Regions:
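N-acyltransferase acceptor-side catalytic subdomain
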Residues: 1-196
Length: 196
């Protein structure tokens, strides 16, 4: 079985590919066409969600519970008995996190982790990997905070890989051809962005 290492993962993201485990735990790499991205300059926050963000209902933390976020994202959900986030993927991304390339944005309420997301930051690219929510809007609020952080840090590309669920559409997610994604990725890798 393929051994995921931080160097292998960084090389993969720099080429526009990413890993997922199949139902047997085997790691496969993907390079979808088309590719889904959130345009950072036109990311749209619906009015109701903007009120929730402003309300302070959730406390947002960054990188305080990276492993817990990954494990929550890996939990089975409605219509999904298993997930592509295997034990080996968790271990590899924890190493990336320790090296400063993988980050989590977490929504907490009354001291309990109720939502969040994680992904990989490489130069001007942030590749969103997965998100979870145990309370309404928790992961969406984390996403809004992620976008604010990426804009402030000089990022130029927020990759969401696949179109995913319909709720992404409300934020302005778009699909672009693989060739256009690779062009934008090359430009993003020339950008000196900062997540902190």
């Amino acid at each position: 079985m393929m051994q995921l290492t931080p160097d292998l993962l960084i090389s993969a993201y720099a080429q526009g590919i990413f890993p997922m485990a199949d139902e047997f735990g085997a790691i496969n790499f993907y390079d979808p066409n088309p590719r889904a991205i959130f345009p950072l300059d036109s990311f749209y926050v619906p009015r109701r969600l903007a009120r929730t963000v402003r309300s302070g209902r959730f406390t947002i933390r960054v990188d305080s519970a990276f492993r817990a976020v990954m494990l929550a994202c890996a939990e089975p959900g409605p219509g999904r008995a298993s997930t592509w986030i295997s034990d080996s993927i968790v271990a590899a991304y924890e190493e990336l996190h320790e090296q400063g390339f993988a980050h989590s944005v977490e929504a907490w309420r009354e001291g309990v982790l109720v939502g969040g997301l994680y992904g990989v930051a490489l130069r001007g690219l942030f590749a969103g990997e997965s998100m979870f929510s145990r309370e309404r809007d928790a992961s969406k609020v984390a996403l809004v905070h992620l976008v604010e952080r990426l804009r402030a840090g000089g990022y130029v590309l927020l990759d969401t890989q696949f179109l995913g669920s319909d709720h992404f559409r409300q934020f302005g997610v778009v699909e672009i051809p693989r060739s256009e994604y690779k062009r934008r990725l090359a430009a993003a890798l020339r950008v000196d962005a900062s997540f902190s």
